[in-house]
A protein has these predicted regions:
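Active-site neighborhood of phospho(di)ester-bond hydrolases with catalytic His/Asp-centered motifs
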Residues: 1-6, 31-36, 94-95, 124-131, ...
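Core catalytic region of metal-dependent phosphoesterases/phosphodiesterases
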Residues: 1-69
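Active-site environment of divalent metal-dependent phosphoester hydrolases
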Residues: 9-12, 37-42, 100, 126-137, ...
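Active-site-proximal segments of metal-dependent phosphoesterases and phosphodiesterases across multiple
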Residues: 50-54, 88-120
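Metallo-beta-lactamase
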Residues: 55-91
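Conserved hydrophobic/aromatic beta-strand scaffold that supports enzyme active sites
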Residues: 81-83, 94, 135, 162-164
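Anionic-ligand binding region
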Residues: 110-149, 160
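Acidic, His/Gly-rich catalytic cores of divalent-metal-dependent hydrolytic chemistry
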Residues: 138-224
Length: 224
């Protein structure tokens, strides 16, 4: 199982998510890196940045309050990017955004994907961050984004997205999946968990994104 980061923040019950990650690692072979959301938490242990409820950082503050010492210790063990070699298959390079930029967004930044693939010394690049499922090839290299389980940007909404990679004849063949799930139950958890009291406007953007598949959260952040 390959995981590309952004495991918690901006959602209810982050401690439950962490427990599921620990269980997954016990039961399966996992290759994991961390994303920008984990960076935010690691950089603010003890709330050095002064995050507050009912502010632009409210949901981050909520998550920070629910993190345990073992969660921070676990995040510290995860690299921001790494290569992955599986016998008989081409080398994969894993990153959250782009190599060297955990917040590099090939879906929003014009020309970034082309630049990254041109310079990439690996045949395959797996990236996340944009939450947008896609595959593209150029310069003899391939970029794959499996999408997002918890916050898919697909202009449809109410789906969890991921990809299955199959090694075939010295190449990787991805199958992209988009699975409907109980979004209404998830939305109720925002209220039941208390996170809605922390996030305010951003939480409304997140919940609208979950229903529509449009990244209102990203555009809300840009507007702040």
């Amino acid at each position: 199982i390959i995981c590309l980061g952004d495991y918690v923040t901006d959602s209810p019950y982050p401690e439950r998510t962490m427990d599921l990650l620990y269980q997954m690692r016990k039961e399966h072979e996992c290759y994991m890196i961390h994303g920008n959301r984990e960076d935010y938490l690691l950089d603010n242990v003890g709330n050095k940045a002064g995050w507050k409820p009912s502010s632009a950082n409210g949901t981050l503050y909520y998550t920070l309050q629910h993190m345990r010492p073992e969660d921070f210790a676990f995040f510290k063990t995860l690299p921001t990017e790494r290569e992955l070699r599986i016998q008989g298959c081409p080398v994969l390079y894993l990153c959250h955004g782009t190599p060297g930029r955990v917040r590099g967004n090939v879906h929003e930044e014009e020309g970034l994907k082309e630049k990254v693939l041109k310079e990439l010394p690996y045949p395959y690049l797996l990236g996340g961050h944009s939450h947008h499922q896609e595959i593209d090839s150029m310069y003899g290299k391939t970029y794959i984004n499996p999408g997002s389980l918890g916050f898919a940007v697909d202009n449809v909404g109410r789906h969890a997205q991921f990809a299955i990679l199959t090694g075939v004849s010295e190449k990787w063949e991805p199958a992209f999946l988009s699975i409907p799930y109980d979004v209404d139950g998830y939305l109720r958890a925002f209220s039941e968990s208390g996170v809605d009291e922390f996030g305010m406007v951003l939480n409304r953007a997140i919940k609208k994104s979950l229903v529509t598949g449009v990244n209102y959260f990203y555009h809300c952040i840009l507007a702040m």
